[in-house]
């Protein structure tokens, strides 16, 4: 279905609400990605509790709004859409890649509404700034002149990363359960980030909570929800079941 946000210049955002029960599992996609990435996982989780996925502005079935926008802008829009769709807290946020920024900002902005987070090979707030430090001025200009996906330029990503760094000071995730799923990226290479650096960043995400678990997903690429959907399903169920104890 489509949700209109009159408070902004976004005419319509496309959302999927399936299942019944509490908590609500909210899926947050990676940069330039849509709800289709979660199709298998959402269909399975919807058999046990309520689920929600949304195409951000300019992606999938949603209309194009004012682009680009920072992660904090996207978080405020997500909160508005959840309210308009009458999808009430508590939320377990399942985030992929750059969607991890949004999950952390959401938890920091609306701390009483988030009961858990599953990070699916998520980005770290320092990785883009570190890339700038390791690049020549010419390389930086090339990267900054490019649009990343259809949502954010490199400069907007740096702004979003700064927002996450600032929200980290609130320590909003300290007492909520989180599971960090990290792909071994078999068969994938990246000139922007070494495997050692990626694992360091992933390990740091684990320290955000005193109730955290880190799972390395072997034989898997960046899109764990597609390559190994059962791993994501099991992680979500682990947090949901833990809440009922």
What are these model-predicted stretches?
Residues 174, 180-182:
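Short beta-strand/loop motif that positions the catalytic acidic residue
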Residues 88-126:
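Conserved hydrolase catalytic core segment
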Residues 152-170, 197-204:
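Active-site nucleophile elbow and catalytic-triad environment of alpha/beta-hydrolase enzymes
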